[in-house]
Amino acid sequence: GEGRMLAYRIDEEVSLRMFDEGDAEEFYNLTIHSKEHLRKWLVWLDQIESLEDITQYIRTRLKIMAEDGGYLKSFAIIYKGKIAGTIGFNAFNKGNKSGVVGYWIGENFQGKGIMSRALKAVIDYGFKELGLNRIEVCVATENEKSRALPERFGFTEEGILRQAEWLYDHYVDHIVYGLLREEWE
């Protein structure tokens, strides 16, 4: 691979690819249908009011990619031809060769092992194609579903960031999980 990963087939059901503006409507519907289910943990989802908001979100992602030499940082997760969620590097530090992975999946797509497959592919991509040495996942301490993923892939629980995020009316602590390239290979 040349590190650009515009589309990546994981298996017969799941693939990752870049967003394009033509995805706006489908992606918007996914966020609307998943709002109740995800809003507890994703404040930005609650702020999406219109198709225009999603189009803007996609444009921003594409702009970040273009500015960064075409390396993809955020992916649409495709399950049987439909957008199921997103995964990608929310933060990226070239000097230290580290990246922070974030992800979410629509309510109807839960419990099919989709996110496990996607995360495994993104970890591979991060270490092999982007040349990262360290990958982090930060999860609210009470978000047990989300915590199960890094734990399954051998991430080390490295510490707690106290009151790391403001969720509507209260702060939540984040657990920082870390995985090093030498632990993955």
Model-identified regions with their sequence ranges:
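Conserved GNAT-fold acetyl-CoA-binding loop/helix
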Residues: R39-T60
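Short loop/turn motifs at secondary-structure junctions and domain boundaries
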Residues: M65-G70, F155
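Acyl-donor (CoA/ACP) binding surface of acyl/acetyltransferases
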Residues: G1-E26, L30-H37, S74-E185
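A short hydrophobic/aromatic micro-motif that marks alpha-helical segments and, especially, helix-coil
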Residues: L38, E49-S50, M65, W184
